Amino acid sequence: MSEEETVSAPAPASTPAPAGTDVGSGGAAAGIANAGAEGGDGAEDVKKHGSKMLVGPRPPQNAIFIHKLYQILEDESLHDLIWWTPSGLSFMIKPVERFSKALATYFKHTNITSFVRQLNIYGFHKVSHDHSSNDANSGDDANTNDDSNTHDDNSGNKNSSGDENTGGGVQEKEKSNPTKIWEFKHSSGIFKKGDIEGLKHIKRRASSRNNSSINSRKNSSNQNYDIDSGARVRPSSIQDPSTSSNSFGNFVPQIPGANNSIPEYFNNSHVTYENANHAPLESNNPEMQEQNRPPNFQDETLKHLKEINFDMVKIIESMQHFISLQHSFCSQSFTFKNVSKKKSENIVKDHQKQLQAFESDMLTFKQHVMSRAHRTIDSLCAVNAAATAASVAPAPAPTSTSAYAPKSQYEMMVPPGNQYVPQKSSSTTNIPSRFNTASVPPSQLFVQYQPQSQQHVTYAKQPAHVPNFINQPIPIQQLPPQYADTFSTPQMMHNPFASKNNNKPGNTKRTNSVLMDPLTPAASVGVQGPLNYPIMNINPSVRDYNKPVPQNMAPSPIYPINEPTTRLYSQPKMRSLGSTSSLPNDRRNSPLKLTPRSSLNEDSLYPKPRNSLKSSISGTSLSSSFTLVANNPAPIRYSQQGLLRSLNKAANCAPDSVTPLDSSVLTGPPPKNMDNLPAVSSNLINSPMNVEHSSSLSQAEPAPQIELPQPSLPTTSTTKNTGEADNSKRKGSGVYSLLNQEDSSTSSADPKTEDKAAPALKKVKM
């Protein structure tokens, strides 16, 4: 098949191209026409790609945008649409319909806006001034384009006659309606005509898609804006509605892999921006900055630098002076032992005066530096304001009293101990002469921050007031006022040991016992104000230190000092085991001894009788922890605590009946063999604790006894004599009657029948 057969049939000159004509058909016709003008070499450039014709040199697959742009500029068939400027540093673009069609040869789109966006991404920017198509055609490039066009018209290729006529009609319309021509230039100037090696240095900007879209919107809004007339101008194809409708109706982009349908953005109407008078952008021009500066800017800058150097020298001298003062004082302080006290005090006073003078000098220096800094800022602002007012309004502005007039007040960070008062002075007498430069006028108003009457202001050392709640009473005035309603009345407990009418405590009967209610309010303790938090119940380590503690201002304590603090605590309550009147006077005043419970249940070791009686004393059951069998004088020891508890119970039963046990009872040998334990008699368990209840307990029926073998223990004559001597003293003792049941029972019987009726039992002497 020949190459002529692949080209579509020619259309009549009067009829436009059909709507179904693809993108490649127009390009193929132009390519064939150019090929005929060059001598018939267009057959090499025409290639068949499926059902579509692609004309022109095909760029490589891996070519990037910048190489494609250079190839488009070198393509002579597109010189009437895009071409180099005479300088070779920029290029011109005619944004018409034919240029959008030509983009399909190198790119996969026909959108001029996308092409401009890619130019912005690679560093190209649009030159501000626009060119018209008539001015552009007057140059050498226009002549070249005209010659090529006439040569194309005179070519003998008949296959492209229809497309040429169509292209000629479009060109005639473009000439009748001249459009603006855009000029683009690379920001770094690397993109030049003939410099192919410099293309590899042009890189894509690492900018986001949002920035590129914003730039494209700015370019699209500025492309049709006429700065001179202030009106928005449209290209010929957009200004004529009929032309635009026909042109877009005939043009349908054909992209490989895309549907043959008109995109939606071609159907939408173009939304124009409102007219706006844009102010000229301020460029970073050094010449303009030099013009905005005051004429004496360099002289003022040099003066400021000199003053800063003087300040540094002053700081160094001040540090040296301070170090010398400390060194001299330390050297003199070692001689205080060899010098009299008065002379040493004079040395300390001289050192303090020198420190005060040094501190005042440093404060003056600081004030001078701060005022000069404010004066410098204000002077520059005043000069700039005057220059701006002179350039805008030629009328003379009202002159101020001084160009260096500072602000009325300045914010300064002042230590909490030093209280400065701003004072205005019309002269600079407080500033040393070395700091009075010629640039400072004598009428300058400095904001002087001077201390009050005291020159040497020291921070008040307030000791942290942490009251000692253990050794020192808390005064009334020390309590904060927010607790006044809490303790409006004194809540101190009665002191049961305090004597009445300043009399010493004696053995007289009194009503204030230790068993009284400790929460009873005191009648009068001499408190003048409200008590706001408890006494002697505050732990300093747990106290909330975030609350401010007032100072100790009250001389009077909250309770009398002569009373010991330990008596404020309530005495422990004792359980009333019996009548307190039954105790003797010497035992009544002595505190009772409390013993803890025994962990061992003593009654579980021996069987109890069925008819066990409960003691009527204080409503408690009789549970002895120290049990002796009548026939066995050896004691059976369970625990010392249980023994003491039983004895304490027995001590409260009857008056004058408590006799201390012998120490040998507590250390008696325990039984080695549990099988040799004696029998526990029911009469022994049911025996009364004192003599008063013996009549009520004598009617109890005895329980059957448990017979156990009884060990024989030797007895001595000393034990018998001791028992006979103490027998008369222990007749009324409840413990004695408990341990020696037979003796107490036979005391009321006939003494003649004692040896016959009573069995041989051993007695345990206390």
UniProtKB/Swiss-Prot annotation:
Q: Please give the residue ranges the record annotates as the region Disordered.
A: 1-52, 129-181, 203-247, 547-619, 657-766
Q: Does the keyword Transcription apply?
A: yes
Q: What is its main location?
A: nucleus
Gene3D superfamilies given for it?
Winged helix-like DNA-binding domain superfamily/Winged helix DNA-binding domain (1.10.10.10)
Where does the record place Polar residues bias? 236-247, 679-699, 738-750
List, in alphabetical order, the Gene Ontology terms for molecular function in this entry.
DNA-binding transcription factor activity, RNA polymerase II-specific; RNA polymerase II cis-regulatory region sequence-specific DNA binding; RNA polymerase II-specific DNA-binding transcription factor binding; sequence-specific DNA binding
Where it sits in the cell: the answer is: Nucleus
Compositional bias (Low complexity) spans?
8-19, 134-147, 208-224, 708-719
Record-linked Pfam families: HSF_DNA-bind
Keywords from the named record: DNA-binding, Nucleus, Phosphoprotein, Transcription, Transcription regulation
What positions are modified (Phosphoserine)?
220, 556, 733
The feature table lists the DNA-binding region at 64-186
Q: Name the Gene Ontology biological process terms.
A: negative regulation of invasive growth in response to glucose limitation; negative regulation of pseudohyphal growth; negative regulation of transcription by RNA polymerase II; positive regulation of transcription by RNA polymerase II
Q: What does this protein do?
A: Involved in cell surface assembly and regulation of the gene related to flocculation (asexual cell aggregation). Mutations in SFL1 causes constitutive cell aggregation.
Please tell me what else the database record remarks about this protein: Present with 1040 molecules/cell in log phase SD medium.
Q: Report the family membership.
A: In the N-terminal section; belongs to the HSF family.
Q: What protein is this chain from? A: Flocculation suppression protein
Organism for this UniProt entry: Saccharomyces cerevisiae (strain ATCC 204508 / S288c) (Baker's yeast)
